[in-house]
Amino acid sequence: MKSGFVSIIGRPSTGKSTLLNSICGHQISITSSTPQTTRNKIKGIFTDKRGQIIFIDTPGFHLSKKNFNIALMNNVYSAIIETELIIYVIDIQDQPGTEENEILTIIQRSKINFIVAINKIDIHKTKEKEIMTFLEEKKIQKNKIIKISAEKQINIETMKDKIYENLNEGPLYYPKEYYTDQKINLRISEIIRGVTIKKLKEELPYSIYTEIEILEDRENKFFIKANIIVAGESQKGIIVGKGGKGIKSIGEESRKIISKILEKKCNLFLQVKLRKNWNKNAKLIKNLIN
């Protein structure tokens, strides 16, 4: 039996979280076209007769000197050194540039085994030729490259085979039925944040976080009270929407997803609260992403 820890890294919006969810068969990590939706190191667990793979989904790799981005990048670096295998996800639509160079340099210096997953091969307009030239120049062997579509489930089984080929014999670190080690509070909080980001498109990606105030299991249903925290007064109105339609829509979609995951009905009450300039508070940022 084989087992091991595998980190998933890449630029923002390359499909890292979609790949994690696709392999594990559950919604574990937020998926969105908005860059850097993932903030924490999210663990997804896949177990079959061959063994167990523990995936660590990381924030999108982005070169920036802002406190928030520096904190996110620290999560990426720590994930790399904790794992036996790295999956480097490249979006087939993206022209390779400075960040690809930096990511590959970090991977190669780490001396950790890796796979390059070229994602979104179902899309017609691509930079495949440029990507393959870039990888060839970096002396990446072809047997380390796999072309996939995480969303369309193309070559995902082949991907699993390739991962197991690169893992050593080892024990099951988690019970077979586990597909994540996230605490329920964090999962619910992340679902609400993900739905909010989806509804708002790219208006407030860095300016919100969510917190669970009350989570109670009351006989036949869960009672949940949660807060969506914003950094500026004007942002409250964007989330609440005209006549409260925005917050209502966020609540309805979040409730459906939470009920499905918890396998029980839930009452979800959402509030939008202002914590001025929270995204400039280094201590709070550290707590949120660790």
From Swiss-Prot:
Compartments where located: Cytoplasm; Cell inner membrane
Region spans: G3: 57-60
InterPro entries according to UniProt: AAA+_ATPase, G_ERA_dom, GTP-bd, GTPase_Era-like, KH_dom-like_a/b, KH_dom_type_2, KH_sf_prok-type, P-loop_NTPase
Region feature G4, mapped onto this chain: 119-122
Era-type G domain mapped to chain residues: 2-169
SUPFAM superfamilies, A to Z: P-loop containing nucleoside triphosphate hydrolases, Prokaryotic type KH domain (KH-domain type II)
Domain KH type-2, first and last residues per copy: 200-276
Main localization (coarse): cytoplasm
Entry keyword annotation includes rRNA-binding: yes
Membrane topology, as annotated: Peripheral membrane protein
Region of interest called G5, as start-end residue ranges on this chain: 148-150
Gene Ontology CC entries for this record: cytosol; plasma membrane
Assembly and binders: Monomer.
Name by which UniProt lists this protein: GTPase Era
Phylogenetic lineage: Bacteria, Pseudomonadati, Spirochaetota, Spirochaetia, Spirochaetales
Name of encoding gene: era
